[in-house]
Amino acid sequence: MILVKLGGSVICGGGLDNVTNDVEPGTVLIHGGGCMVNSVMERMGVKPVILKHPNGYTSRYTDEETLKAYVMTMMLINKLIVSKLNARGIRAIGLSGVDLGLVTAKRKERVMIIDERGRTRVIDGGFSGRVTGVNVNIMNLMLSNSDVVVVSPIALSQEGLMLNVDGDQIAENIAISMNVKELVILTNVDGVLVNGKPIDKVTKANAQEILQYTTGGMRRKLETALKLTELGVRTIIANGLRDKPIRSALNGLGTVVE
């Protein structure tokens, strides 16, 4: 099984065809698409709210109206990917983590933020969550009845709520639950950058030094990859905008974390 996390920056950067033309049977593809969510929200007259957290990360505040835009957009992206794959003769199925209880998550009841005045505050967590599990039986069932499974980052809470979750967390949980040996993370840059230049490899020996040069989403991706190395998973963070991005990444073109 090939596990691919397709970042929204690739989709919004015009790289969707590059990726779908390179997907092979036996692939599980998790996609993002936050930039498209913003566009849909603006058309709906809903202003996106991005939260800043004390750890330096940012996240989307997901209230009820934002959740509607998020689900609509993610499922549109999902079906765009599925339609492109099926047009190539690849039998693809697309679903969210809600379908058949594929991905479960715990709602974030409270989140800590830094407000516009620089003060640290605790606010309601809205409809966002942290992934708690993946139903391996359902995933295997989907893989045995199709060539490719495409997953949107929407999860199901124990209370039956749809939750906005991080696609990287879904990829991490699938990698762990299904004993995946390699994870490809496609973004809009050539890997992990240090002083503007991509580095070939991150290992336990140089990880802390490299982390100092990373921020935001890339830091989160690298931390996920480093966690997976402890479980024997090799992660390649690579540019999804290049030709044959998945094949190139599996051949080591990008930053290999192992």
Swiss-Prot record:
Pfam families membership: AA_kinase
Location relative to the cell: Cytoplasm
Superkingdom: Archaea
GO molecular function per UniProt: acetylglutamate kinase activity; ATP binding; N2-acetyl-L-aminoadipate kinase activity
EC id: 2.7.2.17, 2.7.2.19
A cellular component annotation (GO) from this entry: cytoplasm
Pathway: Amino-acid biosynthesis; L-lysine biosynthesis via AAA pathway; L-lysine from L-alpha-aminoadipate (Thermus route): step 2/5; Amino-acid biosynthesis; L-arginine biosynthesis
Catalysed reactions listed for this entry: [amino-group carrier protein]-C-terminal-N-(1,4-dicarboxybutan-1-yl)-L-glutamine + ATP = [amino-group carrier protein]-C-terminal-N-(1-carboxy-5-phosphooxy-5-oxopentan-1-yl)-L-glutamine + ADP; [amino-group carrier protein]-C-terminal-gamma-(L-glutamyl)-L-glutamate + ATP = [amino-group carrier protein]-C-terminal-gamma-(5-phospho-L-glutamyl)-L-glutamate + ADP
GO biological process, one term: L-arginine biosynthetic process
First-level EC class: transferase
InterPro entries given in the database record: AceGlu_kinase-like_sf, AcgluKinase_fam, Asp/Glu/Uridylate_kinase, LysZ
SUPFAM superfamilies xref list: Carbamate kinase-like (SSF53633)
Site (Transition state stabilizer): 5, 221
Entry keywords, A to Z: Amino-acid biosynthesis, Arginine biosynthesis, ATP-binding, Cytoplasm, Kinase, Lysine biosynthesis, Nucleotide-binding, Transferase
Chain residues that bind substrate: 33-34, 60, 164
Similarity field: Belongs to the acetylglutamate kinase family. LysZ subfamily.
Function: Involved in both the arginine and lysine biosynthetic pathways. Phosphorylates the LysW-bound precursors glutamate (for arginine biosynthesis), respectively alpha-aminoadipate (for lysine biosynthesis).
Protein name per UniProt: Putative [LysW]-aminoadipate/[LysW]-glutamate kinase
